Amino acid sequence: MKILIAMNNRDFFKFEITEENYKSFKTDTSIYNWLKLNDYGYKANSEVYIRKGNISYYGIV
């Protein structure tokens, strides 16, 4: 299980990236492939942009 810390405006959010909730995220192609290839994880100092519903999250993890 991996934790993603993302930023929306000035607020920080923590997400547990699991196989179940991963499918609920709408991401751009690069993040989709990157998360998929890395088993829903992430690399340090990677920029991420995730859209979930009407809310956009952007941050560096």
Regions found by a protein language model. Give the residues of each.
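Short, mixed-charge low-complexity intrinsically disordered segments
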Residues: 32-61
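Short cationic/low-complexity microdomains
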Residues: 18-40
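N-terminal acidic leader/helix
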Residues: 1-26
